[in-house]
Regions:
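A contiguous pocket-lining binding segment that forms or flanks enzyme active sites
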Residues: 162, 168-170
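Intrinsically disordered, low-complexity linker/loop segments enriched in Gly/Pro
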Residues: 99-158, 164
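Terminal catalytic/cofactor-binding subdomain
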Residues: 1-126
Length: 170
């Protein structure tokens, strides 16, 4: 938040104008999370592998593991804050290459908390957008745990899915 927006928000909330009071008041304001995660799965040495990862912010992924054998890479998507609040924007992009097989899940429920009502301190919208692209004969099993939406949330939870004619999505 730039200084002018902070000053406006502080004065609107408290009516105060002292710089000492402003500094202490803004310690309590939360900055928004702008997070992104890109995962790419491909066949490498006859094994479905997580071959590329790119991340920004608190989104992460646990190392792939293989409880069903080398044909299916299992990964946990991790979001340590464990919930989405006003102003947060989470973008997840997953690409499954031809013949690769991935199972994607989460260790816990996703949560959209009550949105802020004072828009002077930021947008109320809470957004999670997932783009999944499955190419060739790729297989994507997407099993996130439940999503809990609290009363007063201003949430967008969007899934955009692109499948080739021979791909599978569960």
């Amino acid at each position: 938040m730039d200084d002018m927006k902070q000053e406006f928000a502080y004065e609107k909330l408290s009516g105060a104008s002292s710089s000492v009071n402003k500094a202490s008041a803004f310690k309590g304001l939360k900055n928004k999370w702008l997070a992104s995660l890109f995962l790419e799965f491909a066949i490498k040495s006859n094994v479905s592998q997580l071959v590329k990862t790119s991340r920004r912010g608190p989104l992460n992924v646990q190392k792939a593991f293989y409880p069903e054998g080398k044909d299916c890479a299992h990964v946990y998507l991790l979001h340590p804050p464990a919930g989405i609040v006003s102003g947060d924007e989470l973008n997840i992009e997953i690409c499954i290459q031809d013949s690769a097989h991935a199972l994607i899940t989460t260790p816990g429920a996703n949560r959209f908390y009550r949105a802020r009502t004072n828009l002077a301190i930021g947008d109320s919208k809470q957004t999670q957008i997932s783009n999944i692209n499955v190419l060739g004969k790729g297989i994507c099993e997407n099993f996130p745990l439940e999503t809990i939406v609290y009363e007063g949330a201003d949430a967008i939870n969007q899934l955009d899915l692109k499948l080739s004619s021979q791909a599978h999505y569960i």
